[in-house]
A protein has these predicted regions:
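Non-heme Fe(II)/2-oxoglutarate
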Residues: 1-99
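Catalytic phosphate/metal-binding cores of nucleic-acid and nucleotide-processing enzymes, i.e., regions
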Residues: 5, 130, 161, 201-202
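Short, conserved beta-strand element in jelly-roll/cupin
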Residues: 110-111, 130-148
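A short secondary-structure junction signal
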Residues: 118-122, 129, 149-154, 185, ...
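A short hydrophobic beta-strand segment most commonly corresponding to one strand
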Residues: 136-141, 171-174, 187-205
Length: 208
């Protein structure tokens, strides 16, 4: 497979959206403690996360080895967190089961109402890519609305990006090695299910 495969910067996967009502999932998540995502492009507790599947048993174990000065040991194994057995998570398993691949980290990422994530890339995670065994990052909005805007830029030199509004229950590939930003102009916290998927041809076929 050619290394420099031409791929979109954002694409809705060729999967039927998850249409059952998942508002109960959002309400359940709103009551949980989230952990701050430490970055240079957000402030305070604006951007937070919890882990559903990762490198520790606790939902606040959101990091992986060798990323963001993580204290996670390199020998740490992937595992489900304590959210695994919660009844509210049943729709999440149904959503994830539609993705034809193995998963690395699976997190819920929250952007508070009225807050922004500044322009950045996710290149700090060296595993992200498109070839077999690399990480393809898939976003599935769980709680959002039309006033949440995701902006992607083709090049670091671009001053103006393309704006997207991602819909609840839809599956989106985002090339997070490209500059991107998010602004939540609504009065509701935005929560995305973010699945880091091990790339394979079947998954790529849903994107290309």
């Amino acid at each position: 497979m050619e290394k420099k495969m031409n791929r979109p910067i954002l694409k809705e996967l060729s999967l039927e959206p998850y249409t059952p009502d998942i508002s109960d999932v959002g309400e359940y998540l709103n009551d949980l403690e989230f952990k701050k995502v430490k970055t240079k492009y957000t402030k305070g507790e604006d951007w937070t996360a919890i882990s559903f599947h990762g490198y520790g048993p606790h939902p606040l174990d959101i990091l992986k080895p060798c990323v963001l000065k993580s204290s996670v040991k390199t020998e740490a194994k992937l595992q489900w967190t304590s959210l695994y057995g919660e009844d509210h998570m049943t729709p999440i398993f149904e959503i994830l089961d539609r993705l034809p691949c193995d998963k690395e980290r699976i997190r819920f990422m929250k952007l508070q109402a009225g807050k922004v994530i500044g322009r950045h890339t996710d290149k700090i995670d060296k595993d992200i890519g498109f070839d077999d065994g690399e990480i393809i990052r898939i976003h599935i909005p769980i709680q959002t609305n039309e006033q949440v805007i995701f902006t992607l830029y083709e090049s670091p030199r671009d001053k103006i990006g393309t704006e997207y509004n991602l819909k609840t229950g839809h599956y989106y590939y985002t090339d997070v090695t490209k500059p991107h930003a998010v602004r939540n102009e609504s009065e509701v916290d935005r929560i995305h299910l973010v699945a880091d998927c091990f790339a394979n041809q079947e998954l790529r076929n849903l994107i290309l």
